[in-house]
Amino acid sequence: MSIETIADVTAPLRTYAALLEGRAGDLHQSLLRYYERERGMHEQISVKLDDNKIAIAIPSLKFYCLSRNRLAFVGKDLIAEIEFFTGKDDQEISILKCYLSTEGKFSFCSVDSEPQYDFYHDRTIEPALFGQLFRAASAKKIISI
């Protein structure tokens, strides 16, 4: 179904915007906590959280990326889109997009892509996200791995 009236936009925003923005912030917090727990990552990777955005760097590979969040509609469903991007030659390059639904489903690349994770109960999201991010950066020739 598509958006047909202003209420199709305002009702989901009123009901779910704060929830989805909070979940996006929770994702960033969980990535930082995962990084802090994994001792092997500290020597080669830097992860910082600032203003509800995450910055990931691998200095030896000259890799740096940031995240940004936005709300978007898929049909009449409001979702949170978390994008990881980098810059090159004054241009932004999207590396990976992740999606969070109001039902707590988390996915990579598209809203319907598999696997779908349970955002609040699946503890494999963080390592999967780091893996997807580095594979996507490699596929786009941003890093070589």
Regions inferred by a protein language model and the residue ranges of each:
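N-terminal, helix-rich and Lys/Arg-enriched segments in bacterial and organellar proteins
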Residues: 31-34, 82, 129, 133
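Generic alpha-helix signal with a bias toward terminal, lower-confidence helices
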Residues: 21, 25, 32, 43, ...
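Charge-rich, low-complexity N-terminal segments
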Residues: 1-53
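Glycine/serine-rich loop-strand microenvironments at binding/catalytic pocket rims
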Residues: 6-10, 56, 138, 142-143
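Ampiphathic alpha-helical segments that act as solvent-exposed interaction surfaces
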Residues: 86-145
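Amphipathic, interaction-prone secondary-structure segments
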Residues: 41-94
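Acidic-enriched, low-complexity/disordered segments with a strong bias for Aspartate over Glutamate
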Residues: 8, 26, 50-51, 77, ...
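Short linear sequence motifs
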Residues: 9, 27-28, 56-57, 77-78, ...
